[in-house]
Amino acid sequence: EAGEECDCGSPANPCCDAATCKLRPGAQCADGLCCDQCRFIKKGTVCRVARGDWNDDTCTGQSADCPRNGLYG
């Protein structure tokens, strides 16, 4: 929703302040395939294994999302 940095549904999330829906100090992310322990996963880390002849999708190091690289190998 507008103004939210993270999903504040669970007070147990160590990366997200459930009262404000903002990331806790020092956190880069709260969830996502490229988020681990509140930090973006290193660029080039496989976040989605390829199917068929397509290449694996990898983290960018700048986002918690796992982009679809869409490259045919």
Curated annotation (Swiss-Prot):
It holds the Pfam family Disintegrin. Keywords: Cell adhesion impairing toxin, Disulfide bond, Hemostasis impairing toxin, Platelet aggregation inhibiting toxin, Secreted, Toxin. Expressed by the venom gland. The keyword Ligase does not apply. A motif (Cell attachment site) lies at residues 51-53. Disulfide bonds join 6-21, 8-16, 15-38, 29-35, 34-59, 47-66. Residues 1-73 form the Disintegrin domain. Its main location: secreted. SUPFAM superfamilies: Blood coagulation inhibitor (disintegrin) (SSF57552). It is found in: Secreted. One of its GO terms (cellular component) is plasma membrane. Belongs to the venom metalloproteinase (M12B) family. P-II subfamily. P-IIa sub-subfamily. Inhibits fibrinogen interaction with platelets. Acts by binding to alpha-IIb/beta-3 (ITGA2B/ITGB3) on the platelet surface and inhibits aggregation induced by ADP, thrombin, platelet-activating factor and collagen. This is Disintegrin lutosin. It comes from Crotalus lutosus.
